[in-house]
């Protein structure tokens, strides 16, 4: 027995390892893995089906085919364990060793490993410094390479053709050594002296100046160093021994009908063995060189195909003409080892079925069909049956269950009680796609789902299916109950809003019961309380909507949790009073004393959660649902065609629009407007008409006139069913009702452009054939889009998860004082996102002061919850610096304070929370709701483009930011700076509106003046850019020569003449170098200086500028000297929706990006070339000037002599995030990406917390490029993990050495995922071959820090409940404690024994 226990112990292999290293395998290493050489290509004997000896399935090498039985059958049973049969040479052991024992093939000639040869950049090529083409020619026996030059003029690794080789032989005899084939490459690699080579290259690096050469040298140095450090030998990249995969991993399966299905690998191996054996024979026979060479080449090709079929030349195909699956194909791609078997596996104890509604369930329950439960919980039932003594053996229990005896059902009930199951609906886009429920047994075959969790699962009941999983172990059950129970997931991790919100019928029911109606039955009653209200309603004495007075008792909790009650009569309705009965005590009555739409209900649940906590909220949500369903049924709201009331005004509006269109058509035909303008105007007219029809329709639908008690007429909100459904948010929207009862409006073509003839009919009137045809256009596009969208969205999520997977909260506080400044998002007159929503759940980075005082309002490191946010709003704080993941100082991971609140729980985040994955899911999950299309600015959109004034909406005072201005003769301000912002501040000092003001705008009111709502505060001409004079004086023309640099033009309509500056391309010879400008002089003729500088006021005019003043005219400051027409760039496409989000996260440089100033200084223009201008910026402190060539067609925002700051926009365009990072820093790029991504989601009405985007940005910024190495071991220009630079610099500073300097890099998410430290994670993401090749050559260690690596090696992940386990292991490793030896308990031993004995004795029962 002792031996047996010892044997069982030996079977549990060690799981204690800290890292995984990948390296090149040396021939000795391969031989040490091997259990024997495979000499024959045979697989199994066709008659006996026994494996052939020395073949690919040989039992002697790989192990027995049957458990504990040798091949010839001499030794059977467990007692001969470990014996090697003398007859057939097979060891008697378990057959599963055939999954792990490897063999090998001794190759007759070395062959190069194709990965190191062809995976770019070619490692062999880099190492030998030879072009890949040359190496290939040597390998495939087309030319010779000099291995040893000896005393001759031949260089080492020089390529010789056949003729050159023969000539050299004649000339030098055997002074030199040249070979061909892999042997040649092998000996070249063997002769490399890595250390010396490295030294030489480093010296070269210091001497060289050319950029390309430096790059090449650094690459080679890095590769050489990798070889030196990792202990890999270069010659191992050429194989002399080929390992053979264990046979059970490349099985040969007999099919019925005597045929066999085989793995492609067997074919590939067979091919290698055949060629190898033939080559051996040829060598023994001393065959002619040319034949041997051919055979060697074929062997090389066979090995290539085995390792990576199709990488070189045509892929080898099988009998069915499709390429064979090689070893590389086994691990890469969606069907490869990583993604198919390691990252996701099929699991036992699971089932799936269609789902239906369970409206009577509680929130934590799901209905499980009895049949399914019986199958899923079988082992538990067997155990219980045996325990109770109802069945003597497992077999008997099995029989009972199969017969479905009555007692079995009772046992099932017991087993299921308190045993949660997991329900999952594919696609699982975020963590709420798997939740735990307590099963309730039901008849039938469909799983019943609680309606409120449908939103989280995105489930509906039109045939969706769901899978059930049973957590088996106690720990798993505990986790399911404590963390995954649906009642614990009330808030969405993406936005922190409740995700368990009623929708559809429930909303309709609640809306119906909380509406009031004029002169309803029972109006004016005074009731003692909600109970009486319900009684009068049930008795039919009062209607649900009657306006009554009811005595209501409210309980209010204060900060300390003391409860005060106040009771009083409230004006309300019967329905609201009845609803009040289910509202938890502690919430104010005002929450229900309003018509409840979807938003109001969501707010009510949110308030309930924040005030009352989890349990009351869950009970309340359930009650809301039951009540809602009940009253929706009572309301009897239904839809008939007469409910779609068509407004009378419709015909008139459409006639007016048609008249306008006709007028524009006439203008077009008489040539007053261009085709583009006509198209845009027509679309504008129809869009406006559509809006008017919709408005008339909604006015018509939403109100009705009724007679009240006093007999007077009164307007009240309508009880039209369609309107109620839309108004409550239950189903439908104003846009849809517009199509039913208004007009369908403008339709789009599949390419996104708008068809200019609208559909004037609606669905109630019906469409004619043409209208119907136009409609089908857009509808089909929609369907095609949806399919594309799903795939793209899924891929975006995958990339996001991959880049962020290893980000986990690892400490409580990193102690940084850094953070990002949060301000409300304001666009024009709208506050898109108030400050409180942006800072809620964040931690302050520094003390927040009361505005205008030095009192501390909120101390540093405070988690801003709802109460603090209310305080901030009362004190009207405008901007707050909060901690952010981007500025977190934690090396690997983030700290809790920088992250702030765990949105799904409402308190500060716990250590070990996988914030990276949560962020990725939160951004990716709504991806399918985003549009795929790029918007054309045309029609409705172009109206916004040509704004020419600012009208404020609210009363307040104006404030200008980064503004330079001059006062013109009329006493108004003229803006002379580029990125000016104008904000409107209310009386509390809060920013209400914010506008961009262009250069040359004239302000009606000055800085700090008060304005009223609706006042126009700024005007400008949208179509031209003025040149504004900053000084007063007399104009002098410089270099303005008629016919050379300018021409005169006369306007046909007005008769006024103006000067137009010629573009330098249009000028003749002498005019080329002239630079037309306007100088401003005083009465004496001296130059006037620009105030505050010693520069004369002269304005250089670009081509196409129009001057309407004459030489010698006196002007005053603020006057327009010239106008530059702005070409409208036609209809520019704005990338919207999903592609835009992907572009931002991939950090793609836009086409024609904005040009930003690289340094601060004064702008001037140097010598021009054919198509480009030379922009020169001279720093004010007299440093080196910065020059840049800019294409002529770019419109510049700066004039000569203007002062720009670093990072200012010189030429407009979409900004490149890389430029923003380089010139404005990390915070600016974070702000840019966050705002741009939010912009896309906001358009779709999706709420995502900024945090999640910041988390991804942090991961995009995790690399840095070394600028100067200091005393560190980094190379200049090397890209290193930012955390590693920080750690190294800290160490260097402690030792008093020079730290390395670096610049942060922004990587797109795909690149960032592939550039991670962990090769396992990168290889399982994309480009598996390249990642593994790189890692093997460098001998990389994977420290298994991230989640993915740990999933792949089959451990608990270092996050969530696995976090403690990993922390414990790290602690033990630091204390150098021995890993606990795996203890085998008696139970396990008996279980294993039983398994062994069953295997031994019951083998022949099959």
Curated annotation (Swiss-Prot):
Residues where Zn(2+) 2 binds: 814, 888, 895, 898
Binding site for Zn(2+) 1: 70, 72, 85, 88
Highest taxon, organism lineage: Bacteria
Gene3D superfamilies: 1.10.132.30, 1.10.150.390, 1.10.1790.20, 1.10.40.90, 2.40.40.20, 2.40.50.100, RNA polymerase II, clamp domain (4.10.860.120), RNA polymerase Rpb1, domain 3 (1.10.274.100)
Keywords of this entry: DNA-directed RNA polymerase, Magnesium, Metal-binding, Nucleotidyltransferase, Transcription, Transferase, Zinc
NCBIfam families per UniProt: rpoC_TIGR
Subunit structure: The RNAP catalytic core consists of 2 alpha, 1 beta, 1 beta' and 1 omega subunit. When a sigma factor is associated with the core the holoenzyme is formed, which can initiate transcription.
Name the record gives this protein: DNA-directed RNA polymerase subunit beta'
Organism, as annotated: Photorhabdus laumondii subsp. laumondii (strain DSM 15139 / CIP 105565 / TT01) (Photorhabdus luminescens subsp. laumondii)
GN (gene name): rpoC
């Amino acid at each position: 027995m002792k031996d047996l226990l010892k044997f069982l112990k030996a079977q549990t292999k060690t799981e204690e390892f800290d890292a995984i290293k990948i390296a090149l395998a040396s021939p000795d290493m391969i031989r040490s893995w091997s259990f024997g050489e495979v000499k024959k290509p045979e697989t199994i004997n066709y008659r006996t089906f026994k494996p052939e000896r020395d073949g690919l399935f040989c039992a002697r090498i790989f192990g027995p085919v049957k458990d504990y039985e040798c091949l010839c059958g001499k030794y059977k049973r467990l007692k001969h364990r470990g014996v090697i049969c003398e007859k057939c040479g097979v060891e008697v052991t378990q057959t599963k060793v055939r999954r792990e024992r490897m063999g090998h093939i001794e190759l007759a000639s070395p062959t190069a490993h194709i990965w190191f040869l062809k995976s770019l950049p070619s490692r062999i090529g880099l190492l030998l410094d030879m072009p890949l083409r040359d190496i290939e020619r040597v390998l495939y026996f087309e030319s010779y390479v000099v291995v040893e030059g000896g005393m001759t003029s031949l260089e080492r690794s020089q390529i010789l053709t056949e003729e050159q080789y023969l000539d050299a032989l004649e000339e030098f005899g055997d002074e030199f050594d040249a070979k061909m084939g892999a042997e040649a490459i092998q000996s070249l690699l063997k002769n490399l002296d890595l250390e010396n080579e490295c030294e030489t290259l480093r010296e070269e690096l210091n001497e060289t100046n050319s950029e390309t050469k430096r790059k090449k040298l650094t690459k080679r140095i890095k590769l050489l160093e990798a070889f030196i450090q990792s202990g890999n030998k270069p010659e191992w990249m050429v194989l002399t021994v080929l390992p053979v995969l264990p046979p059970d991993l490349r099985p040969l399966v007999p099919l019925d009908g005597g045929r066999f299905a085989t793995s492609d690998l067997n074919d590939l191996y067979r091919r290698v063995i055949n060629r190898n054996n033939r080559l051996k024979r040829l060598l023994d026979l001393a065959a002619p060189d040319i034949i041997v060479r051919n055979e060697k080449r074929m062997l090389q090709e066979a090995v290539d195909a085995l390792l990576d079929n199709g990488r070189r030349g045509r892929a080898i195909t099988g009998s069915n003409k499709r390429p064979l699956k090689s070893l590389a194909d086994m691990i890469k791609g969606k069907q490869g080892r990583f993604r198919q078997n390691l990252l996701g596996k099929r699991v036992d104890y699971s089932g799936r079925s269609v789902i239906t509604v369970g409206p009577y369930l509680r929130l934590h329950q799901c209905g499980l069909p009895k049949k399914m439960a019986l199958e899923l919980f079988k082992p538990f039932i067997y155990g219980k049956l045996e325990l109770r003594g109802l069945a003597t053996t497992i077999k008997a229990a099995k029989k009972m269950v199969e017969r479905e005896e009555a007692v079995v059902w009772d046992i099932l009930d017991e087993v299921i009680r308190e045993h949660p199951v997991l329900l999952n609906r594919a696609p699982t886009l975020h963590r709420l796609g798997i939740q735990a429920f307590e099963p309730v047994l039901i008849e039938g075959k469909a799983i019943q789902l609680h309606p409120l969790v449908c939103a989280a699962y995105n489930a509906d009941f039109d045939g969706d299916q769901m899978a059930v999983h049973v957590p088996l172990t106690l720990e798993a059950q505990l986790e399911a109950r404590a963390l995954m129970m649906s009642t614990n997931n009330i808030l969405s991790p993406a936005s922190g809003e409740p995700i368990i919100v009623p929708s559809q019928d429930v909303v309709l029911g609640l809306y119906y019961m909380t509406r009031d109606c004029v002169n309803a039955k029972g109006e004016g009653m005074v009731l003692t309380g909600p109970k009486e209200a319900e009684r009068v309603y049930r008795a039919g004495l009062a209607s649900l909507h009657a306006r009554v007075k009811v005595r209501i008792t409210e309980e209010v909790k204060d900060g300390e949790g003391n409860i005060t009650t106040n009771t009083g009569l409230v004006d309300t309705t019967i329905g609201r009073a009845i609803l009040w009965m289910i509202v938890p005590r502690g919430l104010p009555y005002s929450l229900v004393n309003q018509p409840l739409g979807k938003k109001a209900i969501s707010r009510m649940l949110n308030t309930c959660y924040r005030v009352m906590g989890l349990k009351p909220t869950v009970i309340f949500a359930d009650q809301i649902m039951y009540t809602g369903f009940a009253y929706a049924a009572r309301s009897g709201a239904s839809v008939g065609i007469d409910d779609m009331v068509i407004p009378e005004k419709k015909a008139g509006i459409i006639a007016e629009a048609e008249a306008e269109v006709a007028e524009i058509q006439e203008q077009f035909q008489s040539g007053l407007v261009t085709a583009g303008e006509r198209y845009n105007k027509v679309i504008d007219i129809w869009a406006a008409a559509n809006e008017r029809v919709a408005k008339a329709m909604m006015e018509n639908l939403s109100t009705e006139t009724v007679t009240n008690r006093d007999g007077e007429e009164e307007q009240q909100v309508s009880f039209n069913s369609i309107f109620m459904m839309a108004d409550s948010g239950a189903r439908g929207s104003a846009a849809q009702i517009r199509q039913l009862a208004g007009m369908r409006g403008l339709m789009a073509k599949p390419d996104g452009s708008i068809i200019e003839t609208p559909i004037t009919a609606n669905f109630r009137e019906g469409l004619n054939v043409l209208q119907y045809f136009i409609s089908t256009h857009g509808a089909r596009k929609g369907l095609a889009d949806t399919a594309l969208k799903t795939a793209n969205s899924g891929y975006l999520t995958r990339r996001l998860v991959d880049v962020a997977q290893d980000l986990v909260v690892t400490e409580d506080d990193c102690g940084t004082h850094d953070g990002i400044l949060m301000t409300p998002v304001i666009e024009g007159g709208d506050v898109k996102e108030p400050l409180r929503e942006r800072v809620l759940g964040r931690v302050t980075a520094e003390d927040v002061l009361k505005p205008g005082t030095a009192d501390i309002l909120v101390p540093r490191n405070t988690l801003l919850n709802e109460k603090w946010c209310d305080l901030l709003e009362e004190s009207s704080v405008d901007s707050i610096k909060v901690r952010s993941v981007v500025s977190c100082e934690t090396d690997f991971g983030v700290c809790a304070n920088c992250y702030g609140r765990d949105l799904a729980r409402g308190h500060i985040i716990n250590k070990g929370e996988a914030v990276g994955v949560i962020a990725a899911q939160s951004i990716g999950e709504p991806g399918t709701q985003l549009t795929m299309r790029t918007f054309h600015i045309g029609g409705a959109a172009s109206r916004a483009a040509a704004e020419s004034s600012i009208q404020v909406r609210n009363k307040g005072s104006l404030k200008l930011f980064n503004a330079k201005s001059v006062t013109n003769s009329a006493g108004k301000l003229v803006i002379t700076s580029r990125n000016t912002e104008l904000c409107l501040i209310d009386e509390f000092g809060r920013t209400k509106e914010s506008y961009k003001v262009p250069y040359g705008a004239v302000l009606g009111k000055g800085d700090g003046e008060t304005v009223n709502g609706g006042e126009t505060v700024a005007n400008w001409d949208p179509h031209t850019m003025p040149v504004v004079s900053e000084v007063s004086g007399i104009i002098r023309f410089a270099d303005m020569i008629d016919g050379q640099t300018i021409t005169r033009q006369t306007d046909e309509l007005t008769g006024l003449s103006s000067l137009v500056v010629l573009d330098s391309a249009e000028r003749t010879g002498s005019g080329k170098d002239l630079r037309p400008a306007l100088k401003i002089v005083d009465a004496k003729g001296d130059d006037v200086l620009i105030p505050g500088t010693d520069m004369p006021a002269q304005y250089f005019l670009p081509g196409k500028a129009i001057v309407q003043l004459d030489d010698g005219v006196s002007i005053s400051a603020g006057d327009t000297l010239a106008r530059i027409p702005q070409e409208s760039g036609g209809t520019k496409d704005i990338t919207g929706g999903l592609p835009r989000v992907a572009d931002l996260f991939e950090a793609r440089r836009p086409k024609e990006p904005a040009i930003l100033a690289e340094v601060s200084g004064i702008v001037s223009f140097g010598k021009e070339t054919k198509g480009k201008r030379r922009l020169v910026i001279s720093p004010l402190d007299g440093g080196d000037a910065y020059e840049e060539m800019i294409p002529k067609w770019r419109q510049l925002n700066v004039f000569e002599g203007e002062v720009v700051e670093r990072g200012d926009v010189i030429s407009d365009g979409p900004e490149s995030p890389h430029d923003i990072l380089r010139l404005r820093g990390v915070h600016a790029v974070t702000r840019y990406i966050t705002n741009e991504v939010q912009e896309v989601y906001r358009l779709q009405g999706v709420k995502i917390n900024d945090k999640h985007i910041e988390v991804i940005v942090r991961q995009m910024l995790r690399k840095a490029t070394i600028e100067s190495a200091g005393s560190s071991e980094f190379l200049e220009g090397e890209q290193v993990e930012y955390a590693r630079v920080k750690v190294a610099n800290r160490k260097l500073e402690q030792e008093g050495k020079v730290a390395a300097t670096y610049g942060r890099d922004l990587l797109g998410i795909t690149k960032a995922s592939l550039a991670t430290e962990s090769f396992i994670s990168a290889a399982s993401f994309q480009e598996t071959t390249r990642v593994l090749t790189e890692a093997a050559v460098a001998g990389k260690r994977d420290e298994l820090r991230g989640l993915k690596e740990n999933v792949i090696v089959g451990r608990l992940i270092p996050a969530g409940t696995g976090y403690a386990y990993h922390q414990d292991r790290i602690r033990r490793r630091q204390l150098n404690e021995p890993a606990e030896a795996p203890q085998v308990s008696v139970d396990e031993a008996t279980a294993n024994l039983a398994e062994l004995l069953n295997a031994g004795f019951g083998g022949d029962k099959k």
